Amino acid sequence: WGHARLALTDPWRLLAAAAVVTAARHLWQRTPSIAEALPVRLRTLMSAAATRAALRTGVSTRVAVLLVGFFAVLTIGFPNGRPPSRFDDNELVNLQGRWDAGWYLQIATDGYQHWTSNPATQENIVFFPALPLALRVVGRVLGGTLPAYMAAGTGLVFVAFVIGLAYLYRLARESLGSAESADAAVLLLAAYPFAVYYGAIYTESMYLAGAIGTWYHFRRREWLPAAAWGVLVGLTRPNGCFLSIPLALLLVSPWLPGWLAGGQTLSMADPRPRRVASLVTGGTIDWREAAYGWLTAAAPGVGVLLFCAWTWWLTGDPIAWARGHAAWGRSYLGLWPIIHTYGHWLSSEGLYTVTTHIPVDVLNLCGALFVLALTVPVWRRLGLAAAAFILVNMLPPIAAGGALSAGRLSAVMFPVFLWLASAVPARQRPHWVAAFAVGQGLCATLFYTWRELF
């Protein structure tokens, strides 16, 4: 079992399979042909307001952050004068090989490997497969060299980020009701200090696209695309399965008391009422539609179960990936011990002393506390499901790892940015964006110079 691996060894087989699928589609539906339909669809896509906003914001902010990281490396340098690991002597090529990116690149090039059952030994089994599998495919198509994999990873996360921003724009446009608010939501999320990870070879971009894509299609009762995005979320990161909880709350929210359901901004809504007006028709439940909804809500959990099945085949333990997190400093302690520890430090040492001793932890906690503090306002304006999305994605990791990566986790809390876009007056938004952008510059400097912001 320990030598089993899943690998793509020949990209030409993938391209041949794509050609077969294309030919089959042409035989099944000859008109319009792909050559006729594709340019029209591309023009429609590129002319959409969501696409323009996502491209404009996504590309400009990611390129700017990479430039900040590059010049931080050249001017500030690394701790101890050298990086902990180096993939290439060229700092531009080496720029994206930071922290977890090295593990994703290892999986993409060598596959999953399992040597020991010792939970204190770091192994790549803890990293979920969606990003490294896509990285392997694209990297091999681009030539299979290290720069090719670096370029593939950067391109993948850029594309995923743009898709996530486009979905955020569409969701904000439908739920908040104005293009100005949609633009604000996109810009606020992209400028957020911990949005630095959207340009790194990390899973944040893919998770953002999957989570918002699932939510967008789910509330419109477009079950198939919602389920597809949901499975992707489950295959992207360990907490992907938690998306099933707010999706389930979206389904039951019409039956909840008004005080509990909260706002209805992100609730179920179909702009085409003749298609499916509700899960309730004529006073009775549409059981077929309800079944589709519950099955779709389970899709993120299905994605995690698929990876559990794979790890069971590889290691004999379906949750080996969960046990392996202990080697990264994640073991369940509970929220109260975490709160008590930090509270004791603050009361005995003071904020200044604590900040000077653990500045990165304090920075991470600032991000976590920011989004958690907005849970109640999000609930009151956007709904219980939106608030639950924040809680189930923030509290369990904090209970298991404290401040570790808490800021990074806060970056994908998209309901927070929808709330900010709806609550912050238009005249004040530039100030929020400017403050966020300065913070992201700091985070980029720390991350790309190998300070412990991961």
Segments predicted by a language model, with ranges:
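Transmembrane-helix motifs of polytopic, lipid-linked glycan transferases
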Residues: L135-V137, A152-S175, F370-L374
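Short hydrophobic/aromatic helix or loop-helix immediately within or flanking a transmembrane segment
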Residues: R98-G144, P337-L346, P397
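Membrane-interface transmembrane helices that cradle and orient dolichyl/undecaprenyl
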Residues: L176-A179, T214-P225, W255-G258
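Membrane-lumen/periplasm interface segments of specific transmembrane helices
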Residues: T61-R82, Q96, I125, L232-V233, ...
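Membrane-interface alpha helices of multi-pass inner-membrane proteins
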Residues: A190, F194, A211-Y216, L224-L251, ...
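Transmembrane-helix signature of polytopic, membrane-embedded enzymes
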Residues: P147-A151, L168-A191, A209, P225, ...
